[in-house]
Amino acid sequence: MTLDQLCARRVAVWGVGAEGLALARLLLGRGVVPTLVDDRGHQVEPAVAAAVGAELPVLLPAEVGWASVDVLVRSPGVSRYRPELVAAEAAGVTVTTAMAVWLEDFHHAAVLAVTGTKGKSTTASLAASILEHQGRSVALVGNIGEPVTELYGRPPVDVYVVEVSSYQATDVTVSPRVCVLTSLAPDHLDWHGGVDAY
């Protein structure tokens, strides 16, 4: 799903950390008012208002009427396997991530994705540095710091080096041009629900 397709639907953003807030700002800038969902609920509304420049209610997952949502964009910290998320899908809601949407829109670009259990940040940083020393313009984004949604509206660069956590990769349907797997070991099993899912 592209950003334009997302903006044509009723959107909920689950998780108001860095990635969720960046997506909320992007949607608001395009005239879309998302439903915000977070396990902390209304208590984070003042911080959210300051971060996105608009007063929006923040609902607890149990407060969301899934019939009023077409697409749920989950933040990386929200497990793909949570019962509330499974219930949303059963109600017909499409579940995706900001990373998946961005990759749909930037599939034509030179994207180097770095993932793995350990070593992602180091590898992504080294790759970006090597590319910059070759005279290429580089954006180093993703799990390493700046959310990928911050890239919308910016001038293009030669190479996008993207650190991708297993949480972010779960709903990705478009493959980057190059993907580096640094290592693979049993980790984050509480989030994934077991070794097979991880």
Which role fits each region the language model picked out?
Residues A67, P76-A197:
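Phosphate-binding loop of NTP-binding sites
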